[in-house]
Amino acid sequence: MTSPSTIKQRFLSKPNQLGVVAVGFNGGQCKLGVEAAPMALVEAGLLDQLRDDLDYEIHYDNTVHYYEKEIPAEDPDHRGMKKPRAVSAVTETLSSQVYEHSKEGKFTLTLGGDHSIAIGSISGIAKATRERLGREIGVIWVDAHADINIPEMSPSGNIHGMPMAFLTRLATEEKKDIFGWLQEEHKVNLRKLVYIGLRDVDRGEKKLLREHGIKAFSMHDVDRHGIGRVVEMALAHIGNDTPIHLSFDVDALDPQWAPSTGTPVRGGLTLREGDFICECVHETGNLISMDLVEVNPSLEAVGASDTIRTGCSLVRSALGDTLL
């Protein structure tokens, strides 16, 4: 039996209230199944655990959003991007949904879906935080991949490898129906972005990370310094006066712990290292929102329940669950 967090939340006016958006969207990549993750997480008892064990008042519309009405019949490639209009329309709608929760000072949890949905969740959080607090957000992106491909650089054309490029405005697009809706108010400052867990980074992304001085901790850094020191350095980079959004892709974890994901990469974080990152970010009192993405229950029949359990554990840890 756990109990509610005693950490004072610095940037949430309603810290015991949790706004949840369930996003059943797979259009940022090519594998079916990731759209089933929000329902699987809810059915595994995630929201019940947050309510019963951690005492959150949950604001959830009991709906997994598949956004069928937003998805156009015709969606030809643009600048090499696959399904650009679908991803743009879905993330624009999601941005508004997340904004509505966040502007009230609630913690906002977005359950994906593939990682392209972060274009929606993070833009909504950034806008709400600028309006509510007059501050920029910091983003901690825990992932095997940097997801900062500019469309023309992307080897695959899958938009789940591009969200950070659009959110930081390294990639821009004039067309209203292809991310032209993203404005300055939605932007993430490159100096307030930190990566943890990287180990499969495209050549063009490495160049961008270096050129822009983006703070990134690869698995090499985790091996060298230990996860404790890495998290300490990541948080120091963002600073203690910044509201934090945590975007957690389960493929940051080694496939041993999260096998059911679309792009697994060996040599990743352990389950405890993943939970530890979430625990430490919670302990700052600065965490205002989180995404959990890329759980794909249709891959690896045996591994699906393990991966769902892992996802639940990460979210609980970020929301104040402790071992003792």
Curated annotation (Swiss-Prot):
GO cellular component assignments: cytoplasm; cytosol
Q: Which reaction is the catalytic activity of this chain?
A: L-arginine + H2O = urea + L-ornithine
One protein family per Pfam: Arginase
Q: What GO molecular function annotations does the UniProt record carry, in alphabetical order?
A: arginase activity; manganese ion binding
GO biological process entries: arginine catabolic process to ornithine; urea cycle
Q: Which InterPro entries match?
A: Arginase, Ureohydrolase, Ureohydrolase_dom_sf, Ureohydrolase_Mn_BS
Instruction: Detail which positions bind Mn(2+) 2.
Output: 143, 145, 249, 251
Keyword terms, alphabetized = Arginine metabolism, Hydrolase, Manganese, Metal-binding
Documented EC number(s)? 3.5.3.1
Q: How is the cofactor bound?
A: Binds 2 manganese ions per subunit.
EC category name: hydrolase
Pathway the protein takes part in: Nitrogen metabolism; urea cycle; L-ornithine and urea from L-arginine: step 1/1
Q: Which cofactor does it need?
A: Mn(2+)
Tell me which residues bind Mn(2+) 1. 115, 143, 147, 249
Sites where the protein binds substrate: 145-149, 156-158, 202, 263, 294
The record's similarity note reads: Belongs to the arginase family.
Assembly with partners or alone: Homotrimer.
In its UniProt entry, what is this protein called? Arginase
Species, as recorded: Emericella nidulans (strain FGSC A4 / ATCC 38163 / CBS 112.46 / NRRL 194 / M139) (Aspergillus nidulans)
Lineage of the organism? Eukaryota, Fungi, Dikarya, Ascomycota, Pezizomycotina
Gene assigned in the entry:
agaA
